[in-house]
Amino acid sequence: LIGLVGSEMCIRDSPEGDFIERIRAVIGNKTMISTSMDSHGNVSEKLAKYSDIITCYRKAPHTDALESKQRALDNLVDRLKSGKGKPKYKAWIPVPILLPGEQTSTRVEPGKSLYEKVKPIADSKGVVDAAVWVGYAWGDAPRNHAVVMTVGDNKKAVVNGAEELAQSFWDARYEFDFVAPTTTLDSALNQAFNYQKNKIDNKPFIISDMGDNPTAGGAGDVTWTLDKLLKIKEFKSENGPELIYASIPGPDLILNALNTKIGDKVSGYVGAKVDDRFSPPVLLNGILKAVHLGDKNAEAEVVVQVGSIKVI
């Protein structure tokens, strides 16, 4: 489970909580449920109640996703093979902290130190697993907050482990910050222009729109930034600063591009089919630079150059 699902039918709790409650109603109380989650998800009390064993990623970025899923399976198989059955005790501590993912990398402090404490507690005698959830800040639901959980057979070890992690998280709450400089679009572009003008090195200057993030609940098709970029004079000429815009959904433009030769002109509207609150669909009139077919998700991808901007 990811812990980010939203539903108008589950405002008081969580879709994941309702989902696991219904699973429990089918399989009964004797069957064990081992749950693996994203550390940026939310863990409602109901989800915690019906999960016998629960764990989540210990790294952000989530380079340990498969490892975490494997751990959830290993925990389940171990309890079954050993005959120990369900862990006797479970601690669920909601922590009143709400942080976006961009502030919770485990590669830098304080996230690094906090998550380094998880494994020793999870491996301690009497504990089956321990986990820290940062939570999902953009969910707009009562369960939006951090959570610490431990499960095991030794009540004292389970309680003390959870309290130690929760207290460590709380003590470091003011230390979390963005892992990269943050500013306005205009300021970021000025920095990019100065970077290019001074030719500090040949590395690209990357600007990330953390607001319209489809992996965090955003539509992924907001056109506000693209519309602003297309109006900037420096990018009007094809000889201007090279800018790669990655990316914007545009099924209508895709259809036109598939019937166009590379190097020819192509046009079509892109974006704002899901979220048009801040900017409408944008009409791209440019040169078709590339077509890629076969991506399992996008199916077809194209690059259209407008001025010096290459839009994927």
PLM region descriptions:
Residues 1-6, 10-11:
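Single conserved hydrophobic/aromatic residue that forms the stacking wall/gate
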Residues 99-312:
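Hard-cation-handling environments
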Residues 25-32:
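A short helix->loop->beta-strand "cap" motif at the edges of active sites that frequently abuts
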Residues 5-6, 29, 49-51:
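Short, structured coil segments at secondary-structure junctions
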Residues 80-111:
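Internal, active-site/partner-interface "lid" segment
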Residues 53-70:
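Acidic, His- and aromatic-enriched active-site or binding-groove loops in soluble protein domains
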Residues 14-20, 221-225:
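Charged helix-capping and loop-helix junction motifs
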Residues 35-52, 253-258:
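Glycine-rich, charge-decorated loop segments at or immediately adjacent to ligand/cofactor-binding or catalytic sites
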